[in-house]
A protein has these predicted regions:
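Short, conserved catalytic/metal-binding motifs centered on acidic residues
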Residues: 1, 12, 32-36, 72-86, ...
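Gly/serine-rich nucleotide phosphate-binding loop at the start of the catalytic core
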Residues: 1-30
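Short alpha-helical "patches" and their helix-cap loops
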Residues: 10-21, 54-56, 127-135
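Active-site-proximal, Lys/Arg-enriched surface segment
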Residues: 35-121
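Electropositive, glycine- and tryptophan-enriched low-complexity nucleic-acid-binding patches
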Residues: 96-156
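Short, structured patches in soluble enzyme cores that scaffold and shape functional sites
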Residues: 118-120, 131, 164, 184-188, ...
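Domain-level cores of phosphate- or acyl-group-handling catalytic modules
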Residues: 136-193
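An anionic, glycine-rich sequence signature occurring as long contiguous blocks
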Residues: 181-247
Length: 247
């Protein structure tokens, strides 16, 4: 779906009548959504990863990759995604969960993976992904993925961006040990770091600016927090608040 820039394989199938999918004999060459899904499900990731790296190397050599923020360099975004779910079929790689339905509690089996994309000026570029295994959480899968990225793409990025689930000391230490910076969402209001940051933000005047569409942005940026002792170093906390005026 990332390569086709479509939201689903069904959306891709709707374009099969377009001229660019037809050969000189006017026959349609785009497979159905089911066929595309069946073929991709049998693809070995070991063969896909070299192809993804080749795309990156060529684009880098052709200078078609430009950083979104030149002063910060390139960033990798890590995020978990659920690819499929079923109540009737499962495999050795499925993750089980209990779901409350009208018929009672049922066991649902699903697949989940962590994706790594390179953020650049014109969008994102898929680098790699890692399946989440039974009995582990998303961060464990992301840690394996990140170690492989450090080996396969040692100079491709300078920054790792993730959501609040990744705000853990071992994960941040792994990133820092490889000379990279990390950004994660801080949303657990029980943490000392969150409480200390909110206390200082109340005492500091924000930087205020206007955006298109009647949006007012307030930003706070404070460094030197020591309220995360497990990390072993000071951290920086940034807060933003947007207010939109509706007439």
């Amino acid at each position: 779906m990332l390569l086709s820039r479509m939201g689903s394989f069904n959306a891709l199938e709707q374009t099969k009548s377009c001229f660019y999918w037809k050969k000189e004999d006017k026959k349609e060459v785009l497979p159905s959504a089911d066929t595309v899904g069946n073929v991709i499900s049998d693809v070995d990731l070991a063969t896909v990863r070299p192809a993804l790296k080749q795309v990156y190397v060529r684009r880098k050599r052709n200078k078609s990759l430009k950083p979104l923020f030149p002063k910060l360099g390139f960033a990798v975004i890590l995020d978990g995604h659920e690819s499929s779910a079923s109540y009737k079929r499962c495999c050795c790689g499925c993750l089980p969960r209990k779901v409350e339905t009208d018929a009672g509690t049922r066991i649902q089996f699903y697949h989940r993976h962590v994706t790594a994309v390179l953020l650049h000026r014109d969008g994102v570029l898929l680098l790699d992904l890692e399946m989440q295994r039974p009995g582990e959480d998303e961060v464990a899968a992301a840690t394996r993925l990140l170690k492989r990225l450090f080996h396969d793409y040692p100079r491709a990025f300078d920054l790792v961006i993730a959501d609040g689930l990744y705000a853990r000391a071992p994960f941040f230490k792994l990133v820092k040990d490889h000379g990279k910076d990390a950004i994660a969402v801080l949303k657990d209001d029980r943490r000392d770091l969150f409480q200390d940051a909110m206390g200082l933000f109340k005492q500091e005047a924000p930087v205020v600016f206007e955006r298109d569409g009647g949006v007012t942005c307030e930003c706070w940026d404070i460094e030197g927090f020591t309220s995360w002792p497990q990390l072993g170093q000071d951290v920086r906390v940034v807060r933003s608040r947007e207010t939109k005026t509706v007439k």
